[in-house]
Amino acid sequence: MKHVALRKSSVSLAIALALCMVLGIARADEYADVGALLRQGKPDEALAKADAYIAGKPRDPQMRFMRGVILSEQGRGADATVAFTQLTQDFPELPEPYNNLAALYAAQGQFDKARAALETAIKLKPDYATAFENLGDVYGRLAAQSYGRAQQLDAGSKSLPPKLTLVRQLFATAQTGVAAAPPIAPPPRRTVGKNSK
């Protein structure tokens, strides 16, 4: 989420097209349609189509992941949190839902929960660069909180102001849009037919 400088996995046309090849045209068309509706600024239609698909295939992790992304994009953080939490319970081996769950927790200022979710994502996928970057952002936020509290307790400290300034500058740069745009990560993939019913 922009205001906490965490990067979320999201849906893109390239991913939808890749899914077409991997999952077969009929199923992938559903993913592509939902992704296209979301990109066209029609999140309500995208959500309705995702919900209809999930009604027939409730164990499909890709569409459930897309549904969580749609809810996040709609600003429905509580619903998105439920969606991603359910994914982590049903498919604990998938790192992407943990990453998105962490972004939602961080947006709410729940940095300890965000850290735990990101550590799980990294344990599941040790080369998950986005999760590592997000974990760094969470540690930065936790550092800012700790330095701020320490300064409240010891206003005369000479070592705290430069540390606070450094951490604040780090996040001010990210919030002004100077930081690179987040990369697009695919929704979780499963073997065709496995757990899709």
Where are these regions (language model features)?
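Register position in tetratricopeptide repeats
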Residues: R39-Q40, E73-Q74, A107, R141, ...
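Helix-start (N-cap) detector for alpha-helical repeat units in TPR-like alpha-solenoids
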Residues: R27, P61-Q62, P95-E96, A129, ...
